[in-house]
Amino acid sequence: MNAPKQANISISTHFDSGAIEVVSLADPQDIQLNIRADQGVNGAAEFAQWFHFRLQGLAGVPLKLRFLNAAQCAYPKGWEGYRVVASYDRQLWFRIDTKFNTAFDASSDNKVMTATITPDTNSIYFAYFEPYSYERHLDLLGSAAESEHVQSEFLGHTIDGRDMNVLHITDASSNEANKKNIWLIARQHPGETMAEWFVEGFLERLLDVDDPVSRVLLAKCVFHVVPNMNPDGSIRGNLRTNAAGANLNREWQAPTMQRSPEVFLVRQNMLKTGVDLCLDAHGDEGLPYNFVAGSEGNPGYTAKIEALENAFKASWLATSPDFQTAHGYGKTAKGSANPTLATNWIAQQFNCLAFTIEMPFKDNANLPDAGVGWSGERSKKLGAGVLLPILSVANEL
């Protein structure tokens, strides 16, 4: 029997959120790659950090992936303590050994991130974080809409022609007066896929007919959920921008249909429904913790909002070991907030409680998992758990 021929070696990105630039595949111990900048209809944007690609043909061969431009990416500190995620079946994602020089020198052009693995099969995927596909996004919308408590509303189209939808969720049979309007938006920055995993966990629990927390909240509140604010950027394999090259979380003060239709359409719907609480789910490249950022820098920040913030955080601390308040962005002086950010604009416009929720690309340093780090499943658990702090403040909103 003849020995099988050596498989062809290739790297491909022609799939949802695929992104990498191949410099050299000549040596398995020196696979040279560049992390590709965000891409839009007008060419490259300023951000580069997301990658997602498939490598074929090297089963049983020790590999070293060298990301040559890691030090020139948008958040080079994000590589310190970071480990690449990999998968054979695109279902189970695990972390692999990764190194980056922690003595970072911005003036140097030779700081390279390296990742090593010996693949079990001839096909393996690598990514910055566990991907969340557009197909799964559509499945999430479809499964949620099957609930009697959910109405899916079409808001309009993105620049690439994709649908923007919001899920309106409440117990219509409840006779509760003056229901509170609670918004959850996610993935303004498309490479922050943990944000949509967070929403998936949130929706699964909110729509669980046997969950007492969900039943009470659906009687008291109307939820408005946008699982993916940036579907174009998601499919294009972008870290932070949409198809027009816009960073959506800098568009809230004056969005346009030409540059940021996603924000324009959602903001328009918020003005229609009102907002009593808004959560904006994100991922942070550098900090290995889950945390929130509030609106204390707004000129309209009040003692009531501060009290609500403290109650919300205290409840989350008491109910989730994955949440903490010791590490975060620090406080912004009152009157110095950036009004183009969603949390700041919403809190100021509606005089309400608003948080940016940040999850790590790395791991939760307070509760690490050596196998998967922070992951899609852990993001889902955190999303399900946020219902408790919402319940703790619902009567005071």
Predicted segments, located by residue:
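His/Asp/Glu-rich mid-to-C-terminal helical/loop segments that flank catalytic regions of hydrolases
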Residues: 366-397
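Extreme N-terminal flexible tails
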Residues: 1-124
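A short, polar/proline- and glycine-enriched secondary-structure boundary/capping micro-motif
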Residues: 74-81, 136-139, 176-178
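Well-ordered alpha-helical segments embedded in enzymatic catalytic cores
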Residues: 112, 262-265, 382-385
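Active-site/substrate-binding loop(s) of hydrolase catalytic cores
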Residues: 149-171, 176-338, 344, 355-358, ...
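Extended acidic/polar, glycine-enriched regions
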Residues: 102, 106-160
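Short, proline-enriched alpha-helix->beta-strand connector loops that line the catalytic pocket
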Residues: 350-353
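Short helix/loop capping segments that flank catalytic or ligand/cofactor-binding pockets
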Residues: 75-76, 127, 134-137, 192-194, ...
